[in-house]
């Protein structure tokens, strides 16, 4: 019995060493692809006011019908994500007593752990996803239906300053883009990355683009249409060029 345990242990250690060696071999030989978003020399601050990053992903500051301002990066996000992550943050205000639309971009660096499955992050901060759908947004000058996005209708209970607990609702829209690739599916993104690493020796440098707005219950479709107009106007400036859709 002891000899069998020894054989199993040695075999397991050998496999672990071989796997570790293979990972090191891949890391040394896999090159990083070009980003599918525009990077500019615009610094972003953390919520505490310190410099978070000297470069950022470009988000247009002027769009028809919207005023905008730069957003700050939460300290928790900065401490959780790898230091080579590049961010983009901006809030768009359409006036007319409508809630602002928050735009966010997370661009991975050599450390591919910058981007996680959106469902995990959202539920981790208290949101409940009520409905998940795939939608298409028409972008002027792009092929019809080329921007496919995921849409989450969500709800959350928050505590106000006076101690009262209230329910809020929101619409969250996102997709992923790299150089020459776009997908609304996290699983497709991961599979594409594996394919490119194994077949091309190249890791796509994915960006996770998302937009969020609060929404009154029952007005989610109206909110999505308003967000769609903003996204259609913004995305040609965010992405480096029209991409090839991937699923």
Model-predicted segments: where are they?
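Envelope-exposed proteins and targeting segments
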Residues: 64, 99-101, 205-207
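Short, solvent-exposed recognition patches
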Residues: 49, 67-199
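Generic detector of ordered secondary-structure context
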Residues: 58-59, 84, 201, 226
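Alpha-helical transmembrane signal-anchor/signal-peptide segments
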Residues: 27-50
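Short, charged helix-to-loop "capping" segments that act as catalytic/coupling loops
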Residues: 34-41, 57-59, 198-200
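Amphipathic alpha-helical segments
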Residues: 54-73
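A short, solvent-exposed beta-edge/loop patch
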Residues: 4-28, 136-247
């Amino acid at each position: 019995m002891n000899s069998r345990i020894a054989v199993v242990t040695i075999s397991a250690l050998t496999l672990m060493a071989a796997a570790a060696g293979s990972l090191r071999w891949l890391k040394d030989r896999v090159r990083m692809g070009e980003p599918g978003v525009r990077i500019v020399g615009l610094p972003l601050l953390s919520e505490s006011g310190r410099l978070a990053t000297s470069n950022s992903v470009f988000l247009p500051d002027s769009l028809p019908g919207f005023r905008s301002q730069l957003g700050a990066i939460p300290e928790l996000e900065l401490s959780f994500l790898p230091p080579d992550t590049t961010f983009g943050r901006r809030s768009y205000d359409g006036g007319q007593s409508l809630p602002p639309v928050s735009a966010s971009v997370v661009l991975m660096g050599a450390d591919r752990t910058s981007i996680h499955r959106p469902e995990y992050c959202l539920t981790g901060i208290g949101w409940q996803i009520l409905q998940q759908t795939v939608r298409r947004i028409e972008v002027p000058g792009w092929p019809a239906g080329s921007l496919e996005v995921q849409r989450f209708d969500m709800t959350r209970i928050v505590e106000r300053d006076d101690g009262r607990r209230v329910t809020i609702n929101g619409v969250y829209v996102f997709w992923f883009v790299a150089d020459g690739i776009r997908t609304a599916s996290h699983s497709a993104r991961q599979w594409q990355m594996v394919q490119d690493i194994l077949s091309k020796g190249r890791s796509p440098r994915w960006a996770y683009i998302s937009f969020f707005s609060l929404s009154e219950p029952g007005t989610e479709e109206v909110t999505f249409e308003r967000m769609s107009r903003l996204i259609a106007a913004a995305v040609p400036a965010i992405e480096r060029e029209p991409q090839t859709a991937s699923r």
